[in-house]
Design a protein with these regions (language model features):
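Alpha-helix exit/C-cap motif
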Residues: 39-57
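Hydrophobic alpha-helical segments of small multi-pass membrane proteins
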Residues: 32, 36, 60-62
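Periplasmic/extracellular, small/polar-rich flexible segments of pilin-like filament-forming proteins
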Residues: 51-167
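N-terminal single-pass transmembrane signal-anchor helix
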Residues: 1-25, 29, 36
Length: 167
């Protein structure tokens, strides 16, 4: 009986520390993905500058420029030299395994795309609203226009946002 009581006390004391380690691991995964995506974007931007497409807006019905790069045999679409936030582009650049990372995107050339590690609460969902509610993801996007809250913003440069409150 004494052994069971001692084990129970140890479990109660150790469980919060174990849960914090899991949370820290999820946050570390997301920070690693953010760093890798920023680095990949830097390399892609350099290649886009060499090709002469770093100052071209993304292709759309209004713009027929070829703002794409062929990287490792895969065509990657760009917006001013940076990776457009779609699942296909991110997977092509990052080589993220589907069994370890979920990527959801809105389909817009401006994004956002949500990157979720396997251990996060929103990994299994296919709903962007559920991913946002999980509060454990990396979002990657461009501002759609040049003004946010009355202040000008640069719509040519991507935004990386870590949400870790739910991790």
């Amino acid at each position: 009986v004494v052994v069971i009581v001692i084990l129970g006390i140890l479990a109660v004391v150790a469980m919060p520390k174990f849960l914090n380690l899991q949370r820290d691991a999820r946050i570390a995964d997301l920070k690693g993905a953010e760093g890798a995506l920023k680095s990949a974007n830097g390399i892609v931007y350099g290649k886009a500058a060499i090709k002469g497409v770093a100052e071209q807006e993304a292709n759309d019905w209004n713009n027929s420029s070829d703002s794409t790069l062929l990287i490792d045999g895969k065509t990657v679409s760009l917006h001013y030299g940076y990776i457009i936030p779609t699942e296909g582009n991110i997977r092509a650049i990052m080589s993220m395994n589907k069994s370890d990372w979920s990527i959801l995107s809105t389909g817009s050339r401006f994004g956002p795309a949500y990157i979720i590690p396997k251990s996060a609460p929103g990994f299994q969902t296919q709903s962007i609203s559920e991913v946002e509610q999980s509060q454990c993801y990396l979002s990657y996007y461009f501002y759609k226009n040049g003004i946010i809250n009355g202040k000008p913003v640069n719509y040519k440069v991507p935004v990386y946002k870590l949400e870790t409150a739910g991790c």
